[in-house]
């Protein structure tokens, strides 16, 4: 028997599966099929689009589509599947058993500020409301299946290592990052946020045994993927707390990181509840010290701040108040703000701000601005600030309440964030910072855009023409609002062209032409250019790995 999995990509509060990320869903689904000795082929939805494979799957026994976006996002590595595309795939491939799984079964929308619409059941044999791997584990050998059943970690321990094999079929293999599953559900016991789908999708909070997690990481590393993110957790810092009366589990984290680093070239994380940081300050600082000791620089702990408006926080059952959020940001900066040899901060907070929530007023936008200005004034670093409009899904309080949308104010706030993010990026990635192994993903004219493998990697525009998926090191020279500009590193003035030289701030086209005409250059001080240009050129050549003012 043969099955094909179409990865339509997922993005949820506690999981990301848009390339270069690969979600546990597709790996577990493959593992369940492999367990029953069913051959599996794997395609991303982008491969289907690019190669026009819409009616290429009739010779399979199973056609499985996995997808679902329950938080709004903008993606560089791929575009999540649409309902139209799901219907197209199922209608053009009549022969296989057609199975749909992932959070898309809870509803579909790709745009913030919109309520989700239900999936059309036509052309689908099984819409799996539970966990897709549980259905695929039971159905091939038994009629005793339940489309609402959830997996437990005993099942995951059987199938997860087997599913690692599917990664070799990913079009970007081995330059992908495996989203690792540490826990499911939310550990909060005082209710859930009004908008969050994690309790709907994953149910009651439970934690994966550390030994099983490490076995899967080894299996993934053995197939050639060495990049990992501890992203499949609503609050990563609470991992192991069930074994420690709800408190941070310092010995478990020490074992997790000291073992995981044996398999990893990139080791990053994602979600952290700032309220948990405040509640357990001293223990959390010890956890952060462990992370910073072993992780890869550029790491982020994403905070669900959602709003600095206390009224909005209360009405939406968000777990953190504004002053506590600021304190949590300080704590992560204190421990994680150190930089590696390339000038990249080891671990910084990220902030999620959500609009369209219950109790929001026009003043909410001004309150958020005031708190953001405090962060800037205190010289605190925030790696990224996601500003989004909430998606409303059936089963959430937000879907029931349907609050008023302030679209005009939201647009103005987004404009404000352009200048704010520009200033913050200059602090996080000063001129001279080195980015190793940037993978080119898009070429626009004379600029090649790429990202590193990691958690929310910064979009980097490198002056020059490279090949798609080519890797290069880069040195930062300038900053936008959501991206940075860089030159190939190490910077070689005698091989630099006019486009590269004129991209350096303060060096225009005329100065760049003078430099080119002066080649070969052996002494910067003898160049007939102004002193500011000389200092910048000297800095890039001699001090590329040292962070200092130019």
Over which residues does each language-model region extend?
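N-terminal [4Fe-4S]-dependent radical SAM core
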Residues: 10, 137-183, 192, 227, ...
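Canonical Radical SAM [4Fe-4S] cluster-binding loop centered on the CxxxCxxC motif
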Residues: 172-212
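Catalytic cores of alpha/beta
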Residues: 110-118, 283-287, 358-376
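Terminal RNA-binding accessory module
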Residues: 407-491
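Conserved SAM/AdoMet-binding glycine-rich loop
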Residues: 3-6, 218-350, 355-360, 374
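Glycine-rich beta-alpha loop elements in corrinoid/cobalamin-binding modules
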Residues: 42-155, 437-438
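Alpha-helical interaction/regulatory segments in DNA maintenance proteins
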Residues: 517, 528-550
């Amino acid at each position: 028997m043969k099955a094909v999995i179409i990865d339509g990509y997922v993005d949820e509060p506690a999981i990301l599966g848009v390339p270069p990320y690969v979600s546990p869903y597709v790996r577990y689904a493959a593992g369940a099929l492999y367990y029953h000795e069913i051959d599996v082929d794997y395609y991303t939805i982008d491969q289907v689009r690019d190669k026009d494979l819409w009616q290429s799957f009739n010779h399979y026994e199973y056609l499985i589509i996995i997808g679902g976006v329950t938080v709004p996002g903008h993606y560089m590595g791929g575009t999540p599947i649409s309902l139209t595309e799901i219907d197209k795939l199922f209608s053009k491939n009549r022969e296989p058993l057609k199975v749909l799984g992932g959070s898309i079964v809870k509803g579909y929308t790709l745009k913030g500020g919109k309520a989700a619409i239900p999936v059309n059941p036509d052309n689908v044999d099984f819409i799996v409301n539970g966990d897709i791997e549980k259905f695929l584990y039971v159905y091939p050998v038994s009629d005793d299946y339940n489309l609402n059943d959830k997996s437990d970690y005993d099942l995951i321990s059987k199938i997860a290592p087997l599913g690692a094999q599917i990664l070799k079929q990913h079009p970007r293999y081995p330059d992908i990052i495996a989203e690792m599953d540490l826990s499911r559900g939310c550990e909060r016991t005082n209710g859930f946020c009004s908008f969050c789908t994690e309790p709907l999708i994953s149910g009651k909070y439970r934690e994966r045994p550390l030994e099983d997690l490490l076995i899967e990481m080894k299996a993934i590393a053995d197939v050639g993927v060495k990049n990992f993110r501890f992203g499949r957790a609503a609050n990563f810092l609470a991992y192991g707390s069930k074994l420690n009366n709800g408190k941070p589990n310092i010995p478990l984290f020490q074992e997790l990181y000291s073992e995981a680093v044996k398999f990893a070239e990139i080791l990053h994380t994602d979600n952290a509840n700032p309220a948990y940081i405040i509640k357990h300050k001293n223990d959390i600082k010890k956890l952060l010290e462990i992370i910073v000791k072993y992780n890869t620089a550029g790491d982020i702990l994403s905070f669900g701040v959602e709003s600095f408006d206390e009224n909005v926080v209360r009405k939406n059952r968000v777990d953190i108040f504004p002053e506590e959020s600021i304190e949590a940001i300080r704590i992560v900066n204190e421990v994680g703000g150190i930089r590696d040899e390339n000038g990249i901060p080891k671990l910084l907070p990220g902030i999620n701000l959500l609009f369209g929530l219950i109790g929001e007023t026009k003043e909410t936008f001004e309150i958020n601005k005031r708190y953001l200005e405090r962060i800037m004034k205190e010289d605190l670093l925030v790696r990224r600030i996601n500003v989004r409009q909430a998606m409303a899904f059936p089963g959430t309080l937000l879907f029931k309440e349907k609050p008023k949308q302030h679209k005009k104010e939201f647009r103005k706030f987004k404009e404000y964030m352009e200048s704010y993010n520009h200033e913050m990026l200059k602090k996080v990635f000063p001129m001279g910072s080195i980015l190793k192994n940037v993978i080119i993903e898009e070429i626009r004219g004379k600029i090649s855009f790429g990202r590193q493998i990691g958690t929310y990697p910064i979009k980097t525009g490198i002056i020059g023409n490279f090949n798609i998926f080519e890797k290069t090191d880069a040195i930062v020279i300038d900053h936008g609002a959501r991206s940075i500009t860089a030159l190939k590193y190490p910077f070689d003035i005698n091989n630099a062209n006019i486009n590269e030289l004129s991209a350096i701030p303060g060096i225009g086209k005329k100065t760049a032409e003078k430099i080119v005409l002066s080649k070969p250059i052996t002494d910067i001080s003898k160049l007939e250019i102004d002193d500011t240009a000389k200092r910048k050129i000297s800095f890039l050549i001699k001090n590329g790995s040292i962070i200092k003012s130019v």
